[in-house]
Amino acid sequence: INQKLSAIRRLAVEASDNGLIDGQIASGISRVKGIKKAGVRIGNWLTKDQAEKLINSTDKTTLKGLRDRAILAIMISTGLRRSEVADLTFDHIQQRDGRWVIADMIGKGNRVRTIPMPSWTKVTIDQWTQSANITDGHVFRSVNRHDSLSGDSMTSQAIQDVVKLYADKSGLGLSAHDLRRTYAKLAYRGGSDVLQIQLSLGHESSDTTKRYLGEVQDLTNAPCDFIGIRLDE
């Protein structure tokens, strides 16, 4: 709606400049206010239990399963975009201030950021890389139907396909980008500062981060749950 209003405002100004409508009419049109977007929810996200279910749906007895487990873990625990997961190299994984991080990741708009990574995610990465016997280059590689390495990297679409496979398996309707939203939402509900979430996601504006979060609305603790009305069955 706001985009359409903006186009109408521009059209009114051009019409006034070309003498097609009165200047006062154009001025009135330009003063029409747009709709505020506070609280808008973009996409979907998982609860903590759903996130755990998704990661645990992988098969730890296969090379592909270990890889996919690490992919899901890193996306949910760091908020990396699927393209960033595909681009992730061993050089990115470093220790800073006594903890594991994904260092100097170049993201959207060529913005460089460092993202803290929990130890349990590092464990899943180690399990994958040690089983695959890889120590440098891209962290995530293609695995063929014989459960053997078949390439030295993965595409962004391949990362999306991994997420879809386990989302369908777990009965969850979501995309790879929804795991990024899940990271933001779970971190916020756990008490993380919005600014720190913004920095880790690489958002230029806090407004974008707040839209990920749905502002401060908590659908699991809704006002309607406190009304107390019980109807006869």
Regions found by a protein language model. Name each.
Residues 1-233:
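Conserved catalytic core of the tyrosine transesterase superfamily
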